[in-house]
């Protein structure tokens, strides 16, 4: 039923798992004996973070934040709001911010600056998708599974109006669906 709204599938579930496994192996090497704190940006990061954690073979703690700059639409409002902050004290910690997609970069720049202010030891960004064409602020991810074109994608945590997150793959949403 949801598939009728998808223009094309970009990445299958198996494609995503393969890339995520490779990233997990890299994080294992980079954070051996460091006990990093992975902070997932809800809601979109949940499938990616859950898959990623399965492939990290070192100690890691997790926490979550709810941050929004979209407020239900298809384009960023430009205003970043923290709706739920982390519960963990991050001072002196090695932080890995886990995000489903980097588009404008505003949210991640805001979080990185906030964690610097809170005296995190290191701050790295891991994302499933990076959309450099959408960037309006200067920020780069440290770990990227896929660079993608400037298309509206959904699935594997990515949504349109809180729908399509449950698709096991990532596809391009038909324009007529979000331009109504």
From Swiss-Prot:
Enzyme class: transferase
Alphabetical list of PROSITE patterns matching this protein: PUR_PYR_PR_TRANSFER
Subcellular location: Cytoplasm
Glycosyltransferase found in the keyword field: yes
Active site, per annotation: 103
Catalytic activity: IMP + diphosphate = hypoxanthine + 5-phospho-alpha-D-ribose 1-diphosphate; GMP + diphosphate = guanine + 5-phospho-alpha-D-ribose 1-diphosphate
Binding residue positions for diphosphate: 43-44, 165
Gene: hpt
A matching Pfam family: Pribosyltran
Family: Belongs to the purine/pyrimidine phosphoribosyltransferase family.
Chain sites annotated for binding Mg(2+): 99-100
Gene3D superfamilies: 3.40.50.2020
EC number: 2.4.2.8
A biological process term (GO) from this entry: IMP salvage
Binding site for GMP: 131, 152-153, 159
Molecular functions (GO terms): guanine phosphoribosyltransferase activity; hypoxanthine phosphoribosyltransferase activity; magnesium ion binding; nucleotide binding
First-listed, main subcellular location of the protein, grouped into a coarse class: cytoplasm
GO CC entries: cytosol
Disulphide bridges, residue numbers: none
Keywords: Cytoplasm, Glycosyltransferase, Magnesium, Metal-binding, Nucleotide-binding, Purine salvage, Transferase
The protein's name: Hypoxanthine-guanine phosphoribosyltransferase
Pathway(s) of this molecule: Purine metabolism; IMP biosynthesis via salvage pathway; IMP from hypoxanthine: step 1/1; Purine metabolism; GMP biosynthesis via salvage pathway; GMP from guanine: step 1/1
The organism's place on the tree of life at top rank: Bacteria
Cofactor(s) essential for the protein: Mg(2+)
Biological function: Purine salvage pathway enzyme that catalyzes the transfer of the ribosyl-5-phosphate group from 5-phospho-alpha-D-ribose 1-diphosphate (PRPP) to the N9 position of the 6-oxopurines hypoxanthine and guanine to form the corresponding ribonucleotides IMP (inosine 5'-monophosphate) and GMP (guanosine 5'-monophosphate), with the release of PPi.
